[in-house]
Amino acid sequence: METMPNWLMQRAFLTPDRTAIEIEEEKVTFMQLHEKVVSVCEHLTHIGVKRGQKVAVLMKNGMEMITVIHALSYVGAVAVLLNTRLSREELLWQMDDAEVICLVTDQDFDAKDIPVYSFAEVMNGPKEEASIQEEFSLEEAMTIIYTSGTTGKPKGVILTYGNHWASAVGSSLNLGLRDDDCWLACMPMFHVGGLSLLMKNIMYGMRILLVPKYDADFIHKALQTRGVTIISVVSKMLTDLLERLGAETYPSSLRCMLLGGGPAPKPLLETCVEKGIPVYQTYGMTETSSQICTLSADYMLTKVGSAGKPLFQCQLRIEKDGVVVPAFTEGEIVVKGPNVTGGYFNREDATRETIQNGWLHTGDIGYLDEEGFLYVLDRRSDLIISGGENIYPAQIEEVLLSHPAVAEAGVVGMTDDKWGQVPVAFVVKSGEVTEEEIIHFCEAKLAKYKVPKKACFLEELPRNASKKLLRRELRQLVEEM
């Protein structure tokens, strides 16, 4: 069993006085962060959190969430990170599925069957001596993060200490490390992209400027004045920043804008080239512990639309019907590497289907060019990506079909200037219902960003001979709107 020293403890020992986290005007060193985490450990131990248990975390970006995530690793518990944008029903389902023993949150949340502890309540309560892991076993689970399959049923992706370590090492070999590096973190830490920055923070000994809530004005100013060298963004954020930049440019110390969440439009990249902003396009998912492919800024315009090549310790190929296909042939993107999950929690069926001989079948469609650069054509074909958030049509359709006046439902994405895409519903009625009623019904059951922006009524939905819904025909209807 391969082990490593407890990451934050080791970092606090090696560089105790180096700044770890900056939030607004607060600065915390690695030693101070370690001390805060030990305190949280002692409070969590008092409420009964033990090694091997799963604890749900529903918190916004901030020092509190950082200390809870690290404290759970200190006691050897598994952090089940919940998306704060989900509805109560969705959150309860995930907590039940993950078999959590309790929820730690900074929000008002009522759950009948699961003990709920507010962070303030935990920290104001008694302490108890904690049994702290001085070593991490790389095979052990560290986090569970839920992702939805095209079926719409979320699956808990198990990421081990080894997965997170490999992800951080792969990123450092790709982007390099500098003593003056500062990564601006504006992605939610319940997403693997945000969480991966916490890992890099303690492994690299790198300063992180944490933005509690997405604020384009603050981020724009921080890039100009706070010594930021790297930032992770999605296209929507990049567009917001360019609007604020106007005719100016960012300091040359900004060496990398890591762009994820789907391919970027060419005009956006051309503007970045004009302004000397180095954009690195990436491809990754929860199952790969963040990025697995990156296109360096050198190729921004010669390989427009490409997600680049795999990280050093990763492999990637394109398969069709189980056979590896040559360059420029479309097929399924299949990946392998030490950062790739070993499977889904309590879902042996999905694990067997997705991971074969160590290769993860992503369900995404793409091709490689003659030099091995990846081009992603469709992210899980039916997926809607709205403001960097994944929306699975099947989940919305399930909600629509639970309405008594809805006989059939189909959902596709519609292009939106602000969010990239937004969901649109097509409905066959079985009784009297209005568009407004349908949207209101969805608002009660879905996260706000998943609620259809339009509901259109049809006599029947387009289907093939085997009665499978033809989403491409619904997309054509959207284009004609």
UniProtKB/Swiss-Prot annotation:
Any Gene Ontology biological process: menaquinone biosynthetic process
Superkingdom to which the source organism belongs: Bacteria
Reactions catalysed: 2-succinylbenzoate + ATP + CoA = 2-succinylbenzoyl-CoA + AMP + diphosphate
Pfam families: AMP-binding, AMP-binding_C
UniProt keyword terms in alphabetical order: ATP-binding, Ligase, Menaquinone biosynthesis, Nucleotide-binding
Nucleotide-binding in keyword set: yes
Annotated organism of origin: Bacillus cereus (strain ATCC 10987 / NRS 248)
PROSITE patterns: AMP_BINDING
Gene Ontology molecular function: ATP binding; o-succinylbenzoate-CoA ligase activity
Protein name, per record: 2-succinylbenzoate--CoA ligase
Recorded metabolic or biological pathway in which this protein acts: Quinol/quinone metabolism; 1,4-dihydroxy-2-naphthoate biosynthesis; 1,4-dihydroxy-2-naphthoate from chorismate: step 5/7; Quinol/quinone metabolism; menaquinone biosynthesis
EC class: ligase
Family membership: Belongs to the ATP-dependent AMP-binding enzyme family. MenE subfamily.
Function per UniProt: Converts 2-succinylbenzoate (OSB) to 2-succinylbenzoyl-CoA (OSB-CoA).
UniProt EC number: 6.2.1.26
